[in-house]
Amino acid sequence: MQSRAVILKYRSGSGHKRSLPRFYIDCDLDTFDFEKDCSLIENEFPIYINNYKVVYKSKPTLSHFLIEKEFPAVLGPGMISAVRTRLYEPTMRELYQESIHQLKRSNKKYLLSALRWPTGIPTLEFIDYYFEELLFLSEFDPGSIQRYLKLLVKASGLYNSTNEEQIVEIHRRVLIEGKKHGLTAFDLPGNDILGDICVVQAARVTRLVAKTFSKMTRDTHLMIYFSISPVELVLSKLDKKGDKRAKAKGLMSMSAARSYDYFMRTDLGFRETALSTFWAKDWPTPQETILSDKRCLKEDMRVTKWLPSPPHYPPL
């Protein structure tokens, strides 16, 4: 199946400012050349695969395919075996009950801020599609497919790219954003691209709810999300950060002599260096710094070497 995003002319008469261009999806659902490399998306419709080798085997996550320059013949649970995390399912279900217009009218900043990813504007379109279409889709529906393809364009930001490139870019963004919230490739396996986006949105909501709760304890809406979301994971991290900040403030208030005594008592490396009679340099040489940076870069490449080049604009 071939599809393209057709950008519509800006509507000058409307006083509404748009962050994203108006567009619709023009796709040909009738003609498809199955002799070319293709992958079946959501067990519903095929797309052409040009940049990866299509393989008929099972692996834990989509990342395991991409790192070997491969793409599964079926992008779904049949060939991607890892199960997406269910930790944020209650939060996702609560978000499904929301209206983005009502959230804007009520000025729920913690929710609106969390829902800005991945498009840059607050949206519940991915949550709505997940619960309305993916869970209850029982037959080949051209309208649902066009809606799915439109969400791929919005999530990836790639208006003039193939569906294959859009899916890979979305998976890249999902893993990068998910990592900030403690989610791994096994939590976001890629067998349901839009479902993974919903999980990351729910994780962002959980984080902002946990950070906002202490300031707005009388907000009933906030209390509901606080009670159903796994906020304990976020709070434990915030406590650790708070301990570090308190420790740093305490050290800043110490005199040089007191801070020396403190590190002599608590830091073995500092104590060994202070008591050592061996003469050595006080800082790394430029050559040592370059080698250290190269080692860090190699470690990074081992984790993200499959990631495609980002688009020609800053990620949202």
Curated annotation (Swiss-Prot):
Disulfide bonds: none annotated. Keywords: Host-virus interaction, Inhibition of host innate immune response by virus, Inhibition of host interferon signaling pathway by virus, Inhibition of host PKR by virus, Inhibition of host RIG-I by virus, Inhibition of host RLR pathway by virus, Interferon antiviral system evasion, Viral immunoevasion. Pfam families: NSs (PF11073). GO terms for biological process: symbiont-mediated suppression of host cytoplasmic pattern recognition receptor signaling pathway via inhibition of RIG-I activity; symbiont-mediated suppression of host PKR/eIFalpha signaling; symbiont-mediated suppression of host type I interferon-mediated signaling pathway. It comes from the Viruses. The keyword Kinase does not apply. Interacts with host RIGI; this interaction targets RIGI to proteasomal degradation. Interacts with host EIF2AK2/PKR; this interaction leads to the proteasomal degradation of host EIF2AK2/PKR. Promotes the proteasomal degradation of host EIF2AK2/PKR but is unable to suppress host general transcription. Prevents the establishment of the host antiviral state by interfering with beta interferon (IFN-beta) production. Interacts with host RIGI and targets it for proteasomal degradation, thereby inhibiting RIGI-mediated signaling pathway. This is Non-structural protein NS-S. The gene is NSS.
